[in-house]
């Protein structure tokens, strides 16, 4: 038995040339637990070398009534509206379980565009390619498109993604009650075999001095008949001051291990 400490810090830098555009950079530094001494399973630790790393560089600007973003290490979904009101503690629960579609990432160099209509409806889409093989036959490109509708108390988002090796559909949404908001998502990925996953969570915006989130879902998309693994989490976020918020949380995974026995 061993105890380890892991950390990650992100620095976001942003400037504007016209007041309507923005040039953004994200710098990460961190140290994650090594193999055999612990695990960061479920937590989004991108850096483990204890050195500063440029995690993303993007330029966002208006084009007519649309918004365009181009960048390196930039997610296609950075222009998506989404409809997930849940504040995830673990990476698995991010985007309400639709990380391959509504939360589709980038392959490297990314160009994406979104347009928001006055009615609450929005459309977005983009493409991302490997930096050295942009739109070539040998490179891997990711295409994504999203349609969303949001109102004061509810919203829904549907997205499709294609990375040449697989296609995926995802949908997430939320509904706000007076005391809490429920969010849910489902996703289906086809690589020749269809795999599916789901998420559901509750967000309580006013619990004491902070807010409480409780959720559960699959840790990935699983094919029919495959042994599924589930994750349960709870987190409480509260502000220490105007510039700092602390979010302690707990999570547990549960599924079938060797021989079909349950493993937690």
Where are these regions (language model features)?
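Short, well-ordered, mixed-charge alpha-helical segments that flank or form enzyme active sites
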Residues: 76-80, 132-134
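Long, hydrophobic, well-ordered secondary-structure blocks that form the structural core
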Residues: 80-92
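Beta-barrel outer-membrane channel/assembly domains of diderm bacteria
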Residues: 1-75, 90-130, 139-140, 145-152, ...
